[in-house]
């Protein structure tokens, strides 16, 4: 996702409202006008300074956000923000409650209201993805036309990494889909037998979600993430550039175009 697209997404109310909530306590503390009216301590100068406990909470929040963002496979600024909102709001609720229990309760109610009114925006761009609703149909489609290459994303609806990868996969499908290069998705949470067949763990601690497998002539030829020679799972960042390069989408697209039948007018010219 380009910076231009990310900045356009940031203009949506969901993001800037949640950013304000994420920095609300720090903003209130450092804005003199707000601080002197909300926080009543021994002196006005002390009221607007963060004490040691507040600093500890903020540093702990920073560490948690960094760790969780890496675990969820965040590869863009939007992904980092979306994955950090929950933790920043929890930390702010603790900080507001630490200052005054009523402030903490009011902040929680505000977060609930924002969550109801402003849900996270989903990808609404073009896509050419086949969603397999049946394991048998999935296997039949792979074997139906051996000339067609399939790039299949195995996912679950609840996994944050799968959610982050969804718009990336959709954009790639819109760019590279042809009659002989197709993109598909199958929810292994609904079809555990498929997960078992392709050796993909769908547990809540799984590091294999999402898994993307390239099928050529009905057989698996490559996958990410994969295991090394020692049987250790190699971490893979599902960015658009990484997926293009790893699976050679440009070359696959070129080969798929060459397999297309020649149009009648073009055939006459060749003759």
Curated annotation (Swiss-Prot):
InterPro entries: Thioredoxin-like_sf (IPR036249), Thioredoxin_domain (IPR013766), TMX2 (IPR039101), TMX2_thioredoxin_dom (IPR037463). The chain crosses the membrane at residues 103-123. Its main location: membrane. It is found in: Membrane. Residues 1-28 form the signal peptide. It is a single-pass type I membrane protein. GO terms for molecular function: disulfide oxidoreductase activity. GO terms for cellular component: endoplasmic reticulum membrane; mitochondria-associated endoplasmic reticulum membrane contact site; mitochondrion. Gene3D superfamilies: Glutaredoxin. It comes from the Eukaryota. Keywords: Membrane, Signal, Transmembrane, Transmembrane helix. Residues 29-102 are extracellular. A motif (Di-lysine motif) lies at residues 268-271. It holds the Pfam family Thioredoxin. Residues 124-271 are cytoplasmic. Residues 112-262 form the Thioredoxin domain. The thioredoxin domain lacks the 2 redox-active cysteines, suggesting that it lacks thioredoxin activity. The di-lysine motif confers endoplasmic reticulum localization for type I membrane proteins. This is Thioredoxin-related transmembrane protein 2 homolog. It comes from Drosophila melanogaster (Fruit fly).
């Amino acid at each position: 996702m380009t910076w231009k697209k990310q900045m356009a997404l940031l203009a949506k109310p969901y993001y800037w409202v949640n950013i304000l909530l994420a920095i609300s306590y720090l903003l209130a503390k450092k804005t003199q006008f707000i601080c002197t009216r909300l926080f009543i301590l021994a002196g006005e100068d002390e009221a607007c300074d963060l004490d040691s406990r507040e600093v500890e909470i903020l540093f702990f929040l920073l560490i948690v956000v960094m760790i969780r963002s890496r675990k969820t496979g965040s590869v863009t600024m939007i992904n980092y923000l979306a994955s950090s909102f929950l933790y920043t709001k929890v930390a702010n609720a603790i900080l507001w409650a630490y200052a005054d229990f009523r402030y903490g309760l009011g902040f929680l109610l505000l977060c609930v209201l924002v969550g109801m009114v402003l849900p996270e925006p989903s990808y609404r761009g073009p896509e050419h993805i086949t969603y397999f609703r049946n394991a048998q149909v999935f296997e039949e489609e792979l074997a139906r036309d051996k000339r067609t290459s399939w790039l299949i994303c195995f996912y679950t609806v609840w996994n944050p990494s799968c959610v982050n990868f969804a718009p990336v996969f959709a954009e790639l499908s819109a760019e590279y889909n042809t009659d002989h290069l197709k993109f598909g998705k199958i929810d292994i949470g609904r079809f555990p037998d498929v997960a078992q067949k392709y050796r993909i763990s769908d547990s809540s601690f799984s590091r294999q979600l999402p898994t993307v497998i390239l099928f050529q002539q009905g057989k698996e030829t490559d996958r990410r993430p994969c295991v090394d020679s020692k049987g250790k799972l190699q971490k893979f960042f599902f960015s658009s550039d990484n997926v293009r390069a790893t699976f050679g989408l440009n070359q696959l697209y070129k080969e798929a175009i060459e397999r297309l039948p020649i149009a009648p007018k073009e055939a006459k010219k060749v003759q």
